[in-house]
Structure formats: structure tokens, C-alpha cells
């Protein structure tokens, strides 16, 4: 990945707030937007365990996700198209690290609910009926309409920080 693309990819992951997850069960596709944070090569999000995208992802080896910057110019469309799997997060150390990042990225939550979001492990479950999940990408394609030599290329997630 070129240096300019790497910088744009880093900004995209850390500044974009919404990732769209897509699943398919019994030939019925479904997509859902979720707030996310990037940590340790994974995309973490909170969701209700009974939501359609979580229920439909159970037992699937592959789901898809995308993250794109918003633009009103076609030549500035830039983002990721991904395939991977969803995992429920239960390890306390991972949970605490991710919640701190989540609260930092979505600071309005801490302003509304205070420090209990970090201190109370059950906060998201009690308040929003949501659990922590991680989308682990197996394949990531960078889509960059500003690149004249090729609009789409597979990338290694480990280069993103």
C-alpha cells in the first residue's frame, strides 16, 4: 500500500464511526450499521444478541463488512470491503481496553452516562441490552477511486495502526 493510501486508511479506521455488517441466512440478505472501534486488528462493536445481524451470523463462517468515508465526489470514494467472522467478546481485559477506546471515540456517551460506562462491566448490557462483539476480517479490499492504476486491491490489516 502506498504511503498516501496508508495514511488515508489509518484516518478512515480511526475517524469513521459506522461500519456496515452484512449477513445472509436462508437466501435473505441483511445489513446493519454499527458504531465501531478498531483494536488489535479487529473491529469491535456493541449489539443486542437478539438483533438480526447477530442471530444470522451465528454459525456462519463468513460475514461481510464495509467502512467508507462519505463523499459527494465519485473520485474521492475510499474505504474497505471486508469478509470475516463475528465473535462474542467475554475476556475482561479485552473488554476493558475496547470500552475505553469506545468511550474515547464516542465521547458523547461518557458525557451522558459518566464513568459508570467503564467501571460497570454490565453497563452496556443493562442500559442498551448490548454485548461486545468483534468483526475479525479475513480479507480486506481497499477501494480507492482516486487511484488511477487500480481502484481495488487486497491489503494486509496488520499495516493499519
Segments (PLM) and residue ranges:
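Short Pro/Gly-enriched beta-strand edge/turn motifs at strand-loop
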Residues: 14-20, 114-117
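Short beta-strand segments
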Residues: 16-50, 55, 63-69, 77-81
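Short, surface-exposed beta-strand-loop junctions and turns on beta-sheet-rich folds
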Residues: 51-53, 72, 148-150
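Charged, gly/pro-rich active-site loop segments
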Residues: 78-161
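Extreme N-terminal tail/first-helix region
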Residues: 1-18, 161
Amino acid at each position: 500500500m502506498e504511503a498516501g493510501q496508508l495514511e488515508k486508511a489509518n484516518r478512515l479506521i480511526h475517524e469513521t464511526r459506522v461500519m456496515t455488517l452484512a449477513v445472509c441466512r436462508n437466501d435473505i440478505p441483511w445489513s446493519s450499521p454499527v458504531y465501531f472501534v478498531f483494536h488489535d486488528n479487529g473491529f469491535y462493536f456493541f449489539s443486542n444478541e437478539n438483533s438480526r445481524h447477530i442471530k444470522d451470523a451465528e454459525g456462519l463462517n463468513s460475514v461481510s463488512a464495509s467502512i467508507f468515508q462519505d463523499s459527494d465526489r465519485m473520485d474521492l470514494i475510499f474505504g474497505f470491503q471486508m469478509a470475516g467472522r463475528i465473535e462474542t467478546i467475554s475476556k475482561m481485559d479485552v473488554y476493558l481496553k475496547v470500552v475505553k477506546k469506545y468511550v474515547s471515540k464516542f465521547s458523547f456517551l461518557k458525557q451522558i452516562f459518566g464513568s459508570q460506562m467503564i467501571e460497570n462491566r454490565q453497563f452496556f448490557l443493562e442500559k442498551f441490552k448490548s454485548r461486545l462483539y468483534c468483526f475479525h476480517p479475513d480479507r480486506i479490499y481497499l477501494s480507492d477511486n482516486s487511484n488511477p492504476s487500480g481502484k481495488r486491491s487486497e491489503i494486509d490489516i496488520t499495516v493499519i495502526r
